[in-house]
Amino acid sequence: MSDEMIIRHCSPTLAGLKTGNLFNCPCSDKKELILAVRSLNKRLAPKGIRVIPIQVCEQRVLIYLYRPDKLENDLAVEEAGEILRACGYSTGDGDKCVVRLSRRLQESGDFPHEIGLFLGYPPEDVRGFIENHAVGYKFVGCWKVYGDEKSAKKQFARYKKCTDVYCSQWANGKSIERLTVAV
């Protein structure tokens, strides 16, 4: 799990624009993974970032890089809470919800549809995805949009611009610690 991979997949979260990102990386050695995650958390926690292996498979791991404070705020939205309760979550507490999400990923192997709430997607789009079985959307970008298409398109453009700038800055020698914004 290289810093370059994290920057490519998680720039909007590092910049404070997004609640969280998910990315897959190869994992042949679990001990090495644990050391890498600990090191990354030590480096990024002072900026408000947490990194966890949310799903571990035989030769790969799904990493969740997120901002716990932003997640708490996102999950406190009434519509988000309704979606979580309907999916069997008993609380809106961010840490407990992340543990529950990880269990659901391990148990089913599929992505639980509520996962969008953990990535900063608008609850109306997450609900639309669940209720419409991933069809009937208005637009597709980083997620399928069922609500405010104009706002979503602007957000997608911000995420792309952020990723482009961060990748360029990384290529020019800026460290992940310097690129990560304290929020």
Residue spans of the language-model regions?
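A glycine-rich, hydrophobic loop/mini-helix early in the fold
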Residues: 37-93
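A structured, charge-rich N-terminal accessory region that forms the first stable segment of a protein
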Residues: 1-57
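Internal catalytic-core helix/loop-beta-alpha segment
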Residues: 86-113
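Hydrophobic/aromatic-rich, well-ordered segments within soluble, folded domains that form packed cores
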Residues: 111-138
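Short, surface-exposed beta-edge/turn micro-motifs
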Residues: 18-20, 59-61, 112-114
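Short helix/loop capping segments that flank catalytic or ligand/cofactor-binding pockets
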Residues: 33, 73-74, 127
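Long, compositionally biased
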Residues: 142-183
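Short linear loop/turn motifs
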Residues: 58-59, 98-101, 130-133, 140-147
